[in-house]
Structures are given as structure tokens and as C-alpha cells.
């Protein structure tokens, strides 16, 4: 017998009749509602970025169970603030400061545009949720809120044990409280006494702020006086801070670091943590041969893979390079596809055809020439004739949608062919990236066929690029064997003996601590939404909790000040230097991975 393990997300989703919609579908529906409510005709690819921002705001409102009508009240409408009895004095003061900034007579154009847009947000929020509900779907926050407020849910298990939480959103607090009242909820908190506030709530470190706040409401099932659990940060540790001139230099240093102190031998007790996950690729190329067992939980960017390059070449070929009226294609785009390394999985003749075209300087080769007069099935699939492109347009009332569906279907066919013909290739990155690319394009095809994705081809191409660039590929390794390579979020609730943090700069750790939101800070603060302060406290906890049981710690940061970089170590590194009594070694990484020891400033 063993207990059932689920994430908090699965717990919410399992008790809702709604399904959480995928991000592309959610943005497409939001785009339609936005256009209806505002009358602003914005192309989907231009809308996509701030559609994500708007969706994140709606998600935050629901996860923190705020009243959307009060959050989005009219800035010029002061009587909307008449009833503020539910707000604290501090919250009322925050609101007053914000609304006062809109009462002067020096309106700027930006301010007028913001007020105009803001006045529609409440309508967009309600209309959007209604549209999604009619389809039986919702964004994550809406689903969570529905579950948190539903008093009739039958929780089937006798016990729910919540392990390793830090900051709780209002929906989580509500769910915990519901289960606690049913005597079904038990809580295990993971922290260290070193960063917890004292009885008077005094501590310059915000890492333990939220756990200290929740422990009275949700008591710890573990004995808080056990030093083996809650008093580890002060224990003996070897700690080194290393400054580096570049990110690539840090990646190359990984091999040297792994080669000492039995770090490779200790396998799963060794972790390389990426505060900036963009350096994953150079790290993978720098791993020593002895490190034959590695588990990678950090996602690899789909846009940096060969299959993404092939998809780009295919898009260019089938749009800019397509001479469907002449039943031919432009050699410039044909060559890039035929010479791509994955072209051989479509047809073994690709290289031969490319050489022949170059030799005879056929700048607009016909379908017959490209397909060996129709005798090569792979090439026939790769270079469809003009009938393929024109038939769908003639059969459909909406030629734009039909053309997009045809284009997306063709991309799916080619990518699927590559995957099927290369199924015996052992390269995990190849297999994962090909599958991920297929799922992205196939999802767009589904949305196009059902009419949810109604855009022109130019917009579609830009949208595909945005989606591919933002998509990541999950690596499937063995979590209990080998060296662990992961991002900061993947380290939650895990302990390691040997720890190497890379790119631990201010801006990476804490990560993304900015108010990327339509909702100004003052209003977010007043209505209990997520703010910069919350994000800093969350990352402070991640950082200090990761160090607390480790004994061999190396933290690297980039000291370069070019290309907009500040060259600053993370604020958490500085705070740890001040708060702890450890003799931290300070070193600099020089050329050829040589190390120079220096005294701290």
C-alpha cells in the first residue's frame, strides 16, 4: 500500500466540472471578447502578448478571490470607493494615492488611453468567463475559485497531507480550511529557524514570512523543536562565491566543478541549478564523459532546436516561396528545406535533388522536377502540386481560414513524416522536439478548423513563431539516478549535498520580480493580489531553503556590465553573507577556467 500523490493543481482540477483550457484556445477566445467589448481591431499576434498579461491578471484575481468589479472600478468614478469598510487603513491609503494621481488636470495621452482601456476590463472579465463557461472550460484561476467556493464537494479521501507549501493563494487557503474543518487536512512545513521571524515577528529575512503567518491557522504536524529538521542552516558548510566574465564561462566550469569532491560519484545528491535557463544548451555540451547519468528537469527551448528551423523553412517555402499558379516553388526556399539535416527522413533523394537543381540553375523548379515526376512519395508529400493548395480555397466560403488550415495540415504532415521515419533515432532531444513541434502545430490546426483561429496567413506565421519561441521541451530522465540539472522552481522540497547555482545575478534570483500587469501596484496591494513583494519573499524562501541542508555549496554569478547587465550578485547572496557566520570563499573565474581567490569587498 502507498498513498496517492497529487499536485495541488490536480486536487483542484479533479473536483471541478470545468476543464482548464490550453493557452492558445484561451487567448483566441479572449481576443474575440476584447474586440467585442472595446471595438479595437487588433491582430491576434499583436494582441497575444498583452492577452497573456490580461489573462494572468484575471487568473490572479480569481486565485486571490478578489472582487473583479471593485478591482476594475472606473478611475474617474469616486463614488465607487464610498464603501471601503472591508479594507484596512493601509489598503485605503494605497487606493487613495493611486486615485489621486488621476485627479489632476494634466492628463497625458498615455493616461487617457489607459483610463479608456481600463473602463472595459470589468466587461471583458465577465463576458470572457461567460463564454468559457458555455464551453465547459476555464482558465486555471476560474477553475480553482469554483472549487474553493463550492461547499458541496465530496472529498473522497480520509486524509489530505499538504507538504512543503510556502505562500498560499486565497483559493488554497480556502480549500485547506474546508478540509481542516472536516478533520481531513494535515500540514508539514519545511523551513529553518535561521530565517524565521521571532515571537515579535522580527527578522530582516523575508524567506520565512509566509510559513510563520500560516502556522497558527494550519499547525505543523512535525515537532518544530526538532533540530535535525528545522535547524540545519547553521551546520558546517563549504561555501564559495565565484564571479565569472560570461555565462558561457560558467557553463564550461561545470565540468571542472563536477570532477572534484566525488560530485559525479554521488549522483542524485549533486545538483546544478540554473537561475537563467537560457544557458542549458552550453551546459549540456560541457558535461564530462564520466557524467553518463544525468537527469534534466529544466525545459529546453523549442525555438533553439533543428526541428524549429525546419518548420521555419517550410513556412517560408509554402508561403513566400510558393508559386502555386505556376505549379512551382522558388529555389531559394527549396534549397533550405532540401539541405536541412532532417530532410533525409522525408526522402533519401533530397540531397541529390538539391545538387541537380543547383547544377542546372533552375530558379523556379516545377512540382514534376522536385518529385521526380511523381515517383518519390516523400518528395510528393513535401512539395504538393497546385491542386492541393487551390482545392480547399475553392470549396470553402472562408478562403482565408481554408488556406490556413491547408498550410497547417501540410506542416503537420511533414513533421509527422520526419518523426515516423526517424522513430529508431536514439537522440532524446530530436524525439521530444519533433513531438512537441507537432503538438503545437496540430493544436493550431484544430483551432483553425473549428473557426476559433480566424487570422490571415501573415498573422498566423508570426503567431507560430511566438508560440515556438515560448515553448519548452520537457526532458524525461530518472529522478533517483544521476546528477540533477534543474531550474530554480524544480528544486522545491528537494535537498542536495553538492550544490552549484549558476547565473545567480540580481534579476535572475529573484526572477522576474516586476509588476507585468495591467493592474497598478497600488490596486494590487489594496485588493490582496500578487505583488513584487510577494514574489521576492517567495524566491527568498526558494534560495535559503535550497541551501539549508546542503554541505558543499558553490554559487556563481556574471560580473560583466555590458549589454545592459549590472554585474551584481543576487541580493540573497549579499544577505546570506551578512546574516550567516560562514567563512565564504570569494573567487574569480579567469580565462581557461583558471580560478583566482580574492578577498570580499
Give the label of every model feature segment:
Residues 1-522, 581-594:
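Nucleic acid-machinery interaction/catalytic patches
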Amino acid at each position: 500500500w502507498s498513498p496517492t500523490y497529487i499536485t495541488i493543481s490536480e486536487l483542484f482540477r479533479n473536483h471541478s466540472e470545468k476543464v482548464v483550457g490550453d493557452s492558445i484556445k484561451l487567448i483566441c477566445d479572449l481576443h474575440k471578447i476584447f474586440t467585442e467589448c472595446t471595438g479595437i481591431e487588433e491582430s491576434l499576434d499583436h494582441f497575444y502578448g498583452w492577452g497573456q498579461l490580461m489573462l494572468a491578471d484575471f487568473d490572479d484575481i480569481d486565485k486571490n478571490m478578489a472582487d473583479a468589479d471593485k478591482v476594475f472600478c472606473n478611475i474617474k468614478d469616486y463614488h465607487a470607493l464610498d464603501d471601503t469598510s472591508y479594507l484596512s487603513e493601509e489598503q485605503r491609503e494605497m487606493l487613495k494615492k493611486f486615485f489621486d494621481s488621476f485627479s489632476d488636470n494634466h492628463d497625458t495621452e498615455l493616461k487617457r488611453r489607459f483610463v479608456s482601456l481600463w473602463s472595459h476590463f470589468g466587461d471583458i472579465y465577465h463576458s470572457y468567463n461567460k463564454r468559457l463557461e458555455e464551453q465547459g472550460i476555464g482558465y486555471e484561476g476560474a477553475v480553482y475559485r469554483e472549487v474553493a467556493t463550492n461547499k458541496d464537494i465530496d472529498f473522497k479521501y480520509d486524509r489530505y497531507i499538504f507538504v512543503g507549501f510556502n505562500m498560499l493563494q486565497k483559493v488554497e487557503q480556502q480549500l485547506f480550511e474546508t478540509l481542516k474543518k472536516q478533520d481531513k487536512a494535515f500540514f508539514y512545513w519545511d523551513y529553518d529557524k535561521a530565517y524565521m521571524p521571532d515571537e515579535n515577528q522580527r527578522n530582516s529575512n523575508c524567506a520565512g514570512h509566509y510559513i510563520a503567518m500560516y502556522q497558527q491557522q494550519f499547525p505543523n504536524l512535525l515537532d518544530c523543536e526538532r533540530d535535525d529538521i528545522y535547524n540545519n542552516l547553521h551546520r558546517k558548510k563549504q561555501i564559495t562565491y565565484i564571479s565569472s566574465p560570461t555565462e558561457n564561462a560558467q557553463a564550461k566550469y561545470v565540468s571542472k566543478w563536477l570532477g572534484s569532491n566525488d560530485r559525479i560519484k554521488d549522483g542524485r545528491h549533486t545538483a546544478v541549478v540554473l537561475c537563467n535557463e537560457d544557458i542549458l544548451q552550453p551546459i549540456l555540451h560541457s558535461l564530462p564523459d564520466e557524467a553518463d547519468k544525468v537527469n534534466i528537469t529544466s525545459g529546453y527551448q523549442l525555438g533553439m532546436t533543428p526541428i524549429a528551423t525546419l518548420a521555419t523553412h517550410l513556412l517560408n517555402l509554402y508561403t513566400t516561396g510558393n508559386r502555386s499558379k505556376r505549379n512551382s516553388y522558388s529555389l531559394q526556399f527549396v534549397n533550405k528545406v532540401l539541405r536541412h539535416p532532417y530532410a533525409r527522413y522525408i526522402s533519401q533523394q533530397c540531397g541529390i535533388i538539391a545538387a541537380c537543381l543547383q547544377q542546372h540553375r533552375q530558379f523556379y523548379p516545377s512540382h514534376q522536377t522536385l518529385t521526380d515526376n511523381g515517383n518519390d512519395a516523400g518528395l510528393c508529400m513535401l512539395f504538393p502540386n497546385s491542386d492541393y493548395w487551390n482545392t480547399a480555397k475553392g470549396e470553402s466560403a472562408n478562403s482565408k481560414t481554408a488556406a490556413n488550415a491547408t498550410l497547417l495540415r501540410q506542416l503537420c504532415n511533414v513533421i509527422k513524416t520526419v518523426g515516423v521515419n526517424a522513430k529508431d533515432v536514439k537522440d532524446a532531444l530530436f524525439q521530444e522536439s519533433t513531438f512537441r513541434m507537432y503538438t503545437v502545430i496540430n493544436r493550431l490546426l484544430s483551432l483553425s478548423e473549428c473557426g476559433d483561429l480566424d487570422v490571415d496567413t501573415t498573422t498566423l506565421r508570426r503567431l507560430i513563431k511566438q508560440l515556438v519561441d515560448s515553448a519548452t521541451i520537457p526532458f524525461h530522465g530518472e529522478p533517483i539516478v544521476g546528477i540533477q540539472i534543474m531550474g530554480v522552481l524544480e528544486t522545491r522540497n528537494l535537498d542536495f549535498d553538492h550544490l552549484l547555482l549558476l547565473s545567480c545575478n540580481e534579476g535572475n534570483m529573484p526572477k522576474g520580480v516586476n509588476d507585468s500587469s495591467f493592474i497598478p501596484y497600488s490596486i494590487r496591494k489594496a485588493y490582496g493580489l500578487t505583488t513584487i513583494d510577494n514574489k521576492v519573499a517567495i524566491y527568498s524562501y526558494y534560495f535559503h531553503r535550497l541551501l539549508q541542508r546542503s554541505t558543499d555549496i558553490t554559487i556563481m554569478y556574471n560580473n560583466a556590465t555590458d549589454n545592459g547587465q549590472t554585474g551584481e550578485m543576487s541580493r540573497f547572496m549579499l544577505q546570506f553573507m551578512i546574516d550567516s557566520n560562514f567563512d565564504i570563499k570569494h573567487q574569480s573565474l579567469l580565462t581557461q577556467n583558471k580560478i583566482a581567490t580574492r578577498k570580499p569587498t
